From Swiss-Prot:
Region described as WPP: 44-147
Comp. bias (Basic and acidic residues): 37-53
UniProt note on tissues of expression: Expressed in roots, stems, leaves and flowers.
Alphabetic keyword roster: Cytoplasm, Golgi apparatus, Nucleus, Phosphoprotein
Subunit structure: Binds to FPP proteins. Interacts with WAP, WIP1, WIP2 and WIP3 through its WPP domain. Interacts with WIT1 and HSP70-1.
Positions carrying Phosphoserine: 173
Cellular component aspect of the GO annotation: Golgi apparatus; nuclear outer membrane; nucleus
Name of the protein in question: WPP domain-containing protein 2
GO BP term, example: lateral root development
Keyword Nucleus applies: yes
Chief place of localization: nucleus
Polar residues bias locations: 27-36
Length: 180
């Protein structure tokens, strides 16, 4: 019998249908609900136009200006404060780091933007953007390190920096191991 009472209470305590709600609230929410319905329709059309066989596709490229600014700030921080990179190549002054970081981000964004394809959802482009930033950051700190240490002329340092060797990505050489 208790089960029946609970069922009845549940049925009775259900919220009233929308048509029975206050007309004041209904009048206030009506324009909003029409606007929301319009937005839902627009989003549905957009989602349908971007659907792939596996489901809905979200575009992540191009990044927002806020995202680009966050990347820039992180680059400045990495170049101007102590990090794994600075232990090997040294840090830059804040002004220099800002200039270099802006250049790195703009160049990487340009390269990635030129690689945009209409079929891509942006993941490959974002990956390229990230790799370009990493590559250019490493090139710039190597060039500055080589130029400041005097391991050759500035021209030699720039040539070395423009070529990313396979040793950088692979295991450390015997010479690097002995330095560590």
């Amino acid at each position: 019998m208790a089960e029946t009472a609970e069922t009845i209470n549940t049925t009775i305590s259900s919220p009233p249908p929308e048509s029975e709600s206050s007309t004041t609230i209904s009048a206030m929410t009506d324009p909003t609900s029409q606007e929301a319905a319009s937005k839902d329709t627009d989003l549905t059309k957009e989602a349908e136009s971007e659907k792939k066989p596996g489901g809905i596709s979200l575009r992540i490229w191009p990044p927002t200006q806020k995202t680009r600014d966050a990347v820039l700030n992180r680059l400045i921080e990495t170049l101007s404060t102590e990090s794994i990179l600075s232990k090997r190549y040294g840090t830059l002054k804040s002004d220099d780091a800002t200039t270099v970081a802006k250049l790195i981000e703009e160049e990487a964004y340009g390269v990635a933007s030129n690689a945009v394809s209409s079929d891509d959802d942006g993941i490959k482009i974002l990956e390229l953007y990230s790799k370009e930033i990493s590559k250019r950051m490493l090139e710039s700190v190597k060039a500055r390190s080589n130029a400041s240490v005097g391991n050759g002329s500035v021209e030699d340092a720039n040539t070395d920096a423009s070529e990313v060797s396979k040793d950088d990505a692979g295991p450390a050489s015997e010479e690097e191991k002995s330095e560590a």
